């Protein structure tokens, strides 16, 4: 009888623990990535068939919220070779670390990514930004160039592989 009683208590307790673990895992989603996820409306604006690049001069870092309800993001303003100011959207503030590129106003940059229209405004969603003014190239990578997968959605192992330096192009 005692053995049956222990099983009777253990099984419900185990179920409660499993439910609690699932709730904890679900709540561990980073709120700093809201709206920036792989299948999000924002990410659907990145059409790899429109892949392009341009050169210009870095002007400033800006805070962005591309679509209502998204977590805050980071962008930069680049003056292109025609003198036009381009908003380059990099990614969520919780992921993008601008200090890795060491950009200063006037630095020459090469930006790779896609042109798109968001809320009636033409913007450039970046996959890479290279600082061409610091001697050897320093770059900030935020998406896979092959398919536009955001780096903030990669596993730690995938991210480590992608962060390896590439030969200059």
What role is predicted for each listed range?
Residues 135-169:
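Extended, charge-rich, solvent-exposed interface segments
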Residues 94-111:
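Short nucleic-acid-contacting surface segments enriched for D/E, G, S/T with interspersed K/R
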Residues 116-148:
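OB-fold/S1-family single-stranded nucleic acid-binding modules
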Residues 30-53:
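Short boundary/loop segments of OB/S1/cold-shock single-stranded nucleic-acid-binding domains
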Residues 67-90:
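OB-fold (S1/OB) nucleic-acid-binding surfaces
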Residues 2-13:
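Bacterial N-terminal signal peptides that target proteins for export
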Residues 11-21:
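Bacterial N-terminal signal peptides
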Residues 50-70:
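Structural detector for short beta-strands of small beta-barrel domains
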């Amino acid at each position: 009888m005692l053995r049956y009683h222990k099983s009777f208590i253990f099984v419900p307790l185990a179920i409660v623990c499993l439910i609690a673990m699932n709730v904890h895992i679900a709540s561990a989603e980073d709120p700093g990535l809201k709206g920036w996820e792989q299948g999000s409306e924002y990410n659907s604006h990145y059409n790899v068939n429109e892949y392009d690049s341009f050169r210009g001069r870095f002007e400033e870092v800006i805070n962005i919220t591309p679509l209502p309800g998204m977590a805050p993001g980071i962008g930069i303003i680049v003056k292109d070779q025609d003198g036009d100011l381009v908003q380059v959207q990099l990614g969520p503030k919780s992921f993008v670390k601008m200090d890795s590129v060491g950009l200063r106003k006037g630095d020459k940059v090469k930006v790779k990514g896609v042109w798109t229209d968001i809320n009636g405004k033409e913007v450039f969603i970046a996959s890479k930004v290279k600082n061409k003014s610091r001697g050897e190239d320093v770059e900030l990578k935020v998406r896979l160039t092959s398919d536009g997968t955001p780096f903030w959605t990669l596993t730690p192992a995938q991210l480590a592989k992608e962060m390896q330096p590439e030969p200059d192009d």
